[in-house]
Amino acid sequence: VIPFAVNVVQYPVPSGKRCFMLGQAIRKAVESYDEDLNVHIWGTGGMSHQLQGARAGLINREWDNAWLDQMINDPVGCADTPHIDYVREAGSEGIELVMWLIARGAMSDIVDGKVQGPAPTVKHRFYHVPASNTAVGHLILENN
């Protein structure tokens, strides 16, 4: 297990594009090994939520689910989403979603920053808003 800590608390936080590119670099490093490896890359972070301020309690189910769709089918567009859109639509803590783009950037359909193959297979998708008032999503994708 090799954990990567990505700062999304102290500004400036990395852009989605930068996280997406990190995923591509990780895949390139993994592919450089002479032997087959069993590799799992996990992106983590809460979905829409805001814990403080006038918008405390914000949850945007529609935006979260549209973001999951885009993450699967248009990851380059997802990576190009500006920070202000995350904050506006998903709350101040919604910026955590950029960390998911590390995992998505490492998928085999991404070549030189572009989608050049079939989208990954969705093995599992889940969305829920628990009592903690932080939207939770799970997305398990498998290379084709």
Where are these regions (language model features)?
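Non-transmembrane, aqueous-exposed alpha-helical and coiled segments at domain scale
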Residues: 9, 24-39
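Divalent-metal (often Zn2+) His-rich catalytic cores of metallo-beta-lactamase-fold enzymes
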Residues: 45-55
